[in-house]
Amino acid sequence: MKKRIAIIGAGLSGIAAIKQLTDEGHHVVCYEKAESFGGVFAAKKIYEDLHLTISNYFMAYSDFLPTEQSLKFWSKQEYVQYLKRYLAHFDIEKHIVYNHKVVNAEQNGDKWTVKVQSGSGEETESEFDMVVVCSGHFQEPKTPDLEGLSDFMGDIIHSNDYRDKMAFKGKRVMCVGLGESSADITSEISEVAEKCILSLRRYPAVAPRYMAFQEDPYFTIDTSWLTSRIVNKLPFSYHRGITKNIFHKYVNSRNLHLRIRGEWLHKSGPSIHQAVTKNERLFKPIAEGKVLPNIGGIERFEGNTVIFKDGTHEEIDAIVFCTGYKLSFPFLQHKIECMRDLYKQIFIPSVGSSLAFVGFVRPQQGGIPVIAEMQSRYLAQLASGVKSLPSLEKQKEVIMEDANHWETEYHITPHVASLVNYCHYMDSMARLVGCMPKTPSLLKDPLLRVKLLHNPQFAAQYRLEGPHPMSESSRDFLVNFPNISTWPRIIHFECALAMQKLLSFLSMDNLRELKK
């Protein structure tokens, strides 16, 4: 039986949910409070100079792969154009109702009553079988509670409201916090400000946005199927050594900004166990003295003077808080403080599959769109009755196991409570969906085997089989992508694996069975 489903938000996750649910024939209505699709990428919502920190291959949906023949980091405008093509190709926009804000979603028996408010203020109610929340993380800006901040007389904004660096021309500016957008914003402001200070509580792990495949281990450590499994099976004590191998070539570099990056990476701890900022743009202005970092945090404010925990102080005219966002679902009665309290970070066990949260998982590597797409594929199967959620007890058991795993794996940055390992999470969801790719033998399909094991874990591999497969086009994409690993390494691995299997077969137990 086909369901009537309400989707809240037409951002990257909402678009994925529309596509996967309509693939199963469900009737979908997506309410978007803005006048256009794209969420944070909507026109006028973010600064124009934005470039993605995730490559085109991990920001594109598996059923509409990039047309470029090489790795690229799309600009905001380029990504919006990709989304436009996606919506047009699958006729998705007919399901979106713009300028309509969901003000309340309430469960009544086995139905949901959704109240929406139009741009003119008119309110209407509709009934649905399911509600899918795709409103995203970026709803309620978070700012720290700092002593004396209320007495500061200068300008205070959150990165959510940043549009143009010229607003800070000639001013003494302090940026607080570091993420991908903060690296861009701080760098831009430093070009025009009289002084630009960057306040951080601790040294962050920062990886380059642009990199050569063969030269930078950040590309393969956790995005390759093979290396992900090898690295994550090692004891945590080995991970610092792996990180050292990454930064040692930078700390000895003649290039000052590379040397600074290496020093920060060294001081931040194993990058495998924390959120990583994938944007090194900041290190050039730091090396040039345009950005002055203060590591340790803010003690208090006295008027327009900021006093840091290391005892130093600075006079400033403006503050830009790049300090993230709070979870916010004002239209729901359910209170959610941490997404790790949900089954697969999607479902509230006590509510079941009629309420889903899509796109609230943050992969340490890889992009949110492909994860939201995988979540939506599972949701679509649940809606169609092809799959069903585990028992309440089993869901709670999985929630606890997953939470313990992610808290241990990313213990250096516990405040990023939605962080997951891309490869592990995608595989776990693929098993639920039934689209986990089977690695072929060397005899059956040697080229595909090499690409699956040794190249990044592209979303296309989850279209080789399972519901709504695109076997031929997915295989073509995978086998035509250049090798990340070298052929000598690949051959060495395959020989070692074959030897291991041979030795296992020739074990004493097997020999005894053969003698019988």
Swiss-Prot record:
Top-level taxon of the source organism: Bacteria
Catalysis performed (reactions): 2 bromide + 4-hydroxybenzoate + 2 NADPH + 2 O2 + 5 H(+) = 2,4-dibromophenol + CO2 + 2 NADP(+) + 4 H2O; bromide + 4-hydroxybenzoate + NADPH + O2 + 2 H(+) = 3-bromo-4-hydroxybenzoate + NADP(+) + 2 H2O; 3-bromo-4-hydroxybenzoate + bromide + NADPH + O2 + 3 H(+) = 2,4-dibromophenol + CO2 + NADP(+) + 2 H2O; 3,4-dihydroxybenzoate + 2 bromide + 2 NADPH + 2 O2 + 5 H(+) = 3,5-dibromobenzene-1,2-diol + CO2 + 2 NADP(+) + 4 H2O
Pfam families: FMO-like (PF00743)
Keywords: FAD, Flavoprotein, NADP, Oxidoreductase
Residues annotated as transmembrane: none
Xref: InterPro entries: FAD/NAD-bd_sf, Flavin_mOase, Flavin_mOase-like, FMO-like
EC number of this enzyme: 1.14.19.55
GO molecular function, one term: flavin adenine dinucleotide binding
Main enzyme class: oxidoreductase
Cofactor(s), names only, from the UniProt record: FAD
Residues holding FAD: 13, 32, 40-41, 51, 102, 365
Listed PANTHER family: DIMETHYLANILINE MONOOXYGENASE
Family, as annotated: Belongs to the FMO family.
Known function: Brominase involved in the biosynthesis of polybrominated aromatic organic compounds. Catalyzes the bromination of 4-hydroxybenzoate (4-HBA) to 3-bromo-4-hydroxybenzoate, followed by bromination and decarboxylation of 3-bromo-4-hydroxybenzoate to 2,4-dibromophenol. Can also use 3,4-dihydroxybenzoate, with lower efficiency, forming 3-bromo-4,5-dihydroxybenzoate and 3,5-dibromobenzene-1,2-diol.
Protein name: 4-hydroxybenzoate brominase (decarboxylating)
Chain's gene name: bmp5
